[in-house]
């Protein structure tokens, strides 16, 4: 099962609001999901983003692939940098 971190559209017509969800890549955009890890509001001047960083890092460590838009959001929030640091630390452990 390929797992993706992607946006699910909420809100009303012409006023989008997105949830950042972890879902199976084969499920529809607004369909079944595994876990909600954040929200994204593009209508606010500063593009309001809330994230559960620990859960996002856990899913990335388990192999979840972010969509292009979510990858951009995570990099702006600094989560991807933490993920790469954690991955590089795990590679050097001997055990």
Curated annotation (Swiss-Prot):
It holds the Pfam family Ribosomal_S16. One of its GO terms (biological process) is translation. GO terms for cellular component: cytoplasm; small ribosomal subunit. Gene3D superfamilies: 3.30.1320.10. Signal peptide: none annotated. GO terms for molecular function: structural constituent of ribosome. Keywords: Ribonucleoprotein, Ribosomal protein. Coiled coil: none annotated. InterPro entries: Ribosomal_bS16, Ribosomal_bS16_dom_sf. Belongs to the bacterial ribosomal protein bS16 family. This is Small ribosomal subunit protein bS16. The gene is rpsP.
